[in-house]
Amino acid sequence: MAVATSPSRPASRATPSLRGVVLALFVASGAAGLVYQVVWSRELVLVFGNTTQAVATIVTAFMAGLGFGSLAGGRLAGTSRRPLRLYGLVELAVAAMATLLPFAFHGLADLYRGLWPSLVERPGQLAGVRFGLALAAVAPATFLMGMTLPLLTRYLVRTLDEAGARLGELYAANTAGAMAGTLLGGFVLIELFGLRLTSYLAVALNLTAGLGALALSRRWEAGAGSEEAPAGRDGQLAGPEQAPAGRGARPVRPEVPGWFRPRRRAVLAATFVSGFVSLALEVLWTRMLAEGTGSSIYIFTTILAIFLFGIALGSLLYRRFSRPAGERLGTLGLCLAGVGVLAQATVVLGSGMVGHVPFVVRTVVALLPATVLMGYAFPLAGRLATPSAEAAGGSVGLLYAANTGGSILGSFGAAFVLAGTLGTNGSILLLGGLNLLAGAVLFVADPAGRTDPGRSAPDPDRRAADADRPTVDPGRPTADPGTTGPGAWRGGRGRTRAVGAAMAGLAVLGLVASSLDLPVTRTRTENELRRTGLPVTHAEDELATVDTVGGPAKGRRLLVGGVGMTSLTVDTKLMGYLSKALRPDARDFLVIAFGMGGTYRSGLELGLRTDAVELSPTVPSRMPVFFPDADRFLHHPKGRVIVSDGRNYVRLARETYDMVAVDPAPPIESAGSVVLYTREFLTEGKARLRPGGTFMLWIPYALPMDDFKEHVRTFAGVFGHVRLVLSPGRHGVFMFGSDAPLDFNEASIRQVLGNPAALRDLNDVPDHPPTDADGWVEVVRRSQWLADDRLRSFIGSGPEITDDRPRSEYFLWRRAFMDDREYISESSLLRAAPR
């Protein structure tokens, strides 16, 4: 049997201490990669918008680079004499690209802005352009990132028996680094340094990994290509499989036994399915666990960190407990089936059937068991797909590419197909069933399960592998899986079929339940609302869950993601009426965030051409729950509802307006809402105004006073004239800005708020008493708070909210050490007004 004498074989063995240093470098690389993912995704969202289609495009471009990079890295790993040196060069190249990429985003934004008007009516072509631009921006860097795992696998793997263990170490190290990057970036770095500087700190990590690898390579790979005698276990090569060839030797590939190819195809297929299910579950678990929390960045960071921790822990457990005898298709099948069962069990938490469970507890309980098995399965699959030590890098590259391909489809499937058809919990049941089926197939297909009960059959996999490997690592004992592997405890073919049938039965049960209307397939919010006895509607789209509560006017509510968005209130109607009172000659009105539709409806009542931009496609269709005459306004000739990202629309659209009203989704700290409060957005919004137009931004109460001043300071830094009005419904503050003076006069108030149609509209609310024209004149007079010079005296100097420093979203440490813990309300603002 031919033995490989490839000149690509690394010349030195990675000793335990050297291996520890290499793993530490890979931890740094993993941390940098996660920071890049956060920062670059945010930059691209600002370019393309926060719609599900745009986000899916970004994720696809990012992961496509990783997948193709892993394939290329696997090929290079099989031909490189110095894979550690090549790894170091790749890390330095990532650092160089990451340094330049922030500048490229600006050019990308300008290019997309120029293309958008001609493509906005052709969504298919627009999606293609988005994907092409996102791919051009991030794929070169992510391509290089994808190369790193195969290269280091090639460097560390010296014998076939240790392939899984080394891959487990590497996968655990990189995933642990990603978890560290998640926690440091989400909880510390972005708040302290901003997005741009945080990305440069990640560049420093790549530089450390790259330079460290090059230094190690000079010391330990310097002899590559020279003749070296095989040596023993203590840090040197042993056996002909590890001996480097002399100069000029013709590389001979080790023969791959016939039984191996079908097994590798099965492993690759299972890895593809696992990638699909895992990424889809991550999307759906995030939606399920974040429901009702307000969706702050700290919630998402915690979910992702626990997800990554479980994967890293699973890989470490594989490294600690795996044995060659247990590295079977059946073991991989058990892992996949276990993930399926545990995933299906999480819907009990997601439906609220166990009562109130603190967020961190339910996140750990839901994610940790399944993700540990995910982390265990990947290095196991890598070992099963590797025919020889020389092929380890290529096998891992192929495996990672298959996993990434499944992940891309999983992210699309979860958002665009599953959530909208089966709902969050139903989709989780379906995905769990899919993993169970995949696990059952692998379990039954394992040759070890086809031995007769009580008999021991020689393992064909091990026997063929031993024939190809004249030497083995004395540190890793071999065993006959017919007596010590899965075949022994499985008890033969009959029991194998029984276990496989049980897996399939659980899968079918989950698949059937996923399409039924059961308490376990409903979200926690829907179950809670149904118990009130009020009329409730529930829907899910690619963005979020949408629940409405009908009945008496005072109790009507709209909830998105389990969080109350708004209720029937005079404040939403006044957003249009007060803007019109400031500019009585206004003809056009732009509303950002549809909500119940109250502001949009009032704009049409005022006779304005009204455009409303809403991110969720489901929310506008719920307007009839709150307004009996909703159909008239939804189909009004002067009205237009645009399902899009409000920030993106303001930046790209060429229309101009006399009035703009922005009412971001609460809470004000939620991830995604901050982009409607930054200086850059306000500047773009100002550009959509005609001369003399008014821009209204809503600030809810229950915000720390210092944070409130930051918002006002940012707003006042963009608009030359600013006036703040305390809402009559006592829910928050209207901030009005313009390039012209802003003054309410009695005549315009009577004209806009005092006519019969306006009075009917404004008085049809449960949170404000019926008022006549004189009463509204007095209400507006009392509600005015600060303007221009007095306002600037109140806010003083200090930081503003920007895209790079999203201070309203990242606030943890600032609030932890905040001296003034006063939260704004009507009374606190009246006390704080300068005399």
Name each model feature, range by range.
Residues 2-455, 461-746, 750-751, 805, ...:
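Alpha-helical transmembrane segments of multi-pass membrane proteins
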Residues 743-835:
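SAM/dcSAM-binding transferase cores
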